[in-house]
Amino acid sequence: VNETLPNGVAPWHQASYAAFLREHLPALLARRLPLNAYSVEQSGGRARIELDVDTTHLVVEAVPWPDAEGVFHLDGRELVVLPVADDRELDKATVRCVGEQLYEFVEPRVGEGPSGMVWTDELLASWLPIGRWILDFLEPSEGGGTVQPVDNLNWLARIEHLRRLRIEHVRAPGARPGEDERVELPGQMGRVCPIMKPEGPNFPIIHSIARGAVIRDGRIEAMDDSPDMLLSVTAAAIPFLNCDDANRALMGANMMRQWLPPAEPQAAFVLAGTEPDVPDLWCGRNLLTAFVSWGLDTFEDGLVISASCAECFGLSQPLEPGDKLSNRHGTKGVVSRILPDDEMPRLADGTPVDLVFSFIGLHTRMNFGQLKEAVLGRVAHRRGEGMVAPAFDGPDDEALKQTLRENGLPETGMEVLRDGRDGSPLERPSTVGYVYWGVTRHRPRTKVHAHPGGPANRQGELEYYALRDLGASALIGETFGLRSLRTEGSPLANPDRIDYPLPQPQGLTPVFTDLQARLRDLGVAAELQNDALAFSEAECPDGLELALPMPHPWLPERMIRSVGRRADWPEFRALEQANEHIRRVVAQHAPEQLTGRARRTLAARLAEYAKALLPPDAMRFGEPVAFSARAVIAPLDSLDVSQIGLPEDMAWALFGPLLPDRDEESLDLLMAESWVIANRAPSLGATSLLAFHPVRVPGAVIRLNVSTCRLLNADFDGDQLAVFLPLTAEGHREAGELLSVEAHVRRDASILNQLCPNHEALWGLAWLGLTPEGRRQADAQFPESLLPTTGLLDATTIAQAVQTVRERHGLPTALETIERLTRLGLEATRKSGASLNPFAGTSTPQPQCPDPLTVSCWFEQADDLADQILCRGDYDSLDIGPQLLAVKAGVRGSVEQLLAGLVGAVIVDSESNLLYIPHGRLRGYTPNEVFVHTVGAHRGLWQVIAQCEQLGQQARSRHQPQGYHVLARAMRSRCPGTVFARAAARAELDPLTDVDAKLFIGLAGS
């Protein structure tokens, strides 16, 4: 560890805390009190403070003390306090570690002792509850505070957590969301890792301290600028990092921290050379990996593993479908199928592979380091010793080929695999080798939930918009009314048996009754009168009487005398305390100065209570819904597009209460006649809600037909799906008529294109179309001959032919045709053995320019280079044939991505300067090229994250009510309370002509 981290794991935590207790705290006390003596004694994980104020002695026992790594051990918990930088330009930033943060916490609490005060033991102990202050500070808070439980999942998770840094101010002045903000800056280089960051909204906020950096005296200093010392511990442990796209390397590093530790560690065959000699570091297994398609089971990141592989990790439970695996290069997927060893594809010598991952996305994700690792891993396995490939200095292609030759292995890194089921060879050589994989903490048994009652999955505002736009008013009433678990005493909270189907709800929605109660707490009445909503001012007789009449927080020109009680709300408790304080002040006839201060405090607490009482979200649908379930998804070949596979336990949980007895035949019959609604958040389009007929399947994952993935924006890398069961006859009818796959296509015929074969299925059809026999085979899947006799069978050609089937033969026939085409294409891809050559690019054109090549020269030739690639038709080439076919058939990727991966590219640095890279990512970038590329890659990733954050707001703006009556205005307002208070003051009547207002109240049927 000392060699990996020459400055120590994280010495700044303990140093900062020691400085607080030994220097800064006594200095503070000396300024506020007559401090005569102060000392600290530390032993193990505790310290003892002794101090004298005037002539009074105080001893503080059992004060927490962090260990050498900066970890506090309290009541069986391990806690760490993240350092915080006040500027994203870290070379200029002040960094506050635990000691500085604790000082800020304690300083306002230390009162100044008045001159002449007589100190007693009791007074001093109550004046300076130092031990309690420190314990209060060290209590983790919700919402991303700096005090956090240590992530002890594995060794890397722990080390990286202790070496984490938080940046407070991340937006550049004047920057728009996602624009020139939260990206790498020059002052961060050498101080934090440019690769390793969170993948969500904390992307620019949380950083991993570089191996060569240290926090000292309130600054973060770069002590070593050698390339591998600029990385975090985890990123530096990725071999061939310079062959990976920066965002994929980010994913790889993050997922290594999520790997479950096996019973027995196994070191990787291919090392980066920076790994410490710590057995607990190794959480994965070296798996013989084939980068080929294996039909439907490897579609959209699905994994096929062998039975031996399922057992080899030594976890408490063997792997099963739904388990998520990842490697160090950012490839991830869930197990879709576990095959007997003798059914797996096998090497020429009969060795079965352990894991199959599809080649189809490799040229677009550009995490080519895994291919190089596979090649070198075979050498390491052959030699029986580890091989080293540093992050920035792994062996080049010629060295790898020579090593392969010297060890009796194919110098291409590829060989023809055989199908384990019948021994037949695949049609072309495939890349295969040993790659280090780990199992993430996201195990399927922990992710599957099924709730006939509570706790339940939530349906929110976006789901409401989708249902509203489809005209599913009955489902809205059922989802946000009948099946809402917000209503106290709901009969569906703990249902053992229900009379199915239930009647359609007729009462008010829980969200509206909740709104009425909230408004009443601040003196506004909202009552239905003859299908209209009347607003008026009202008293709150059972509420908290205010000590003084106060301006209404929503309508300052009106006075309020009482508020509703919500004793469990912190905002109400604070208001109650402020009210009691001013009551005492007034009763004691205190000076106006004190009375005015107390009045201002009461007004502030009242405003905070009002804000908490009616935030904008209170005007939006969002309910925990009974009879809901959730699980990880995986593909299944026996399902058609109208079906979804529910795990056995989930099926019984949802449908069991609808049956008089636990009878499997009755269950299957009921499921076959029923619809369930599948939903994958965020619900940004109509097809994010799909109705399926459910069938029982073994295991702990929800199974999908692969053709529906694009409709749900889902893939098989760990995505989860929520499932909801309608309980009313009308809701059930709407599910089938409005939300089924057929219903969506009948409403919008273009949706059929999204169901057409894609990814490996489309590649396989294009591959078949290269020969007359294969083309005839594809054409035979149609009810009549529709495919052209020449030209590439690309996405457009297939989609047009399928649309013709719909027009001539009807939608059911078109869907059946898609099923046949998808199965044919997937099988063709599986048999092809198509892969990505680890040394691809030897046949690609190179720019013809003087040396050194300039940016302008590259731009002059880029279009010509792209044209040269697109003019090629050698799809059976061992060099880039499969990737060329994927691009030209519209399967995946672009010619620009082929150029970037194989030829060269122009990238943008942190100062927006252009830099030409004269070789493809597959060859490996120099350290400087990696760091420059990372800036642009992360900027793009942050823009995507920022856009995702804005999608909900954009959807709200697009779908919000357009009316001008009270409810519609309040739904649009950032302060709905003001809208309601003014309506009450004017005694307004909302006629409820707006559809959103009627649905919100529960009058959809009116």
Region locations from a protein language model:
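Phosphate-interacting basic helix/loop segments used at nucleotide- and nucleic-acid interfaces
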Residues: 36, 53-57, 63-67, 174-180, ...
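Extended, low-charge hydrophobic alpha-helical regions
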Residues: 470-471, 480-492, 868, 872-1006
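Helical mechanochemical/support elements of P-loop NTPase systems and associated helical scaffolds
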Residues: 77, 94, 98, 188, ...
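Long amphipathic alpha-helical segments
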Residues: 331-337, 370-372, 408-416, 434-454, ...
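Conserved N-terminal architectural modules of multi-subunit, DNA-dependent RNA polymerase core subunits
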Residues: 1-203, 207-304, 314, 320-323, ...
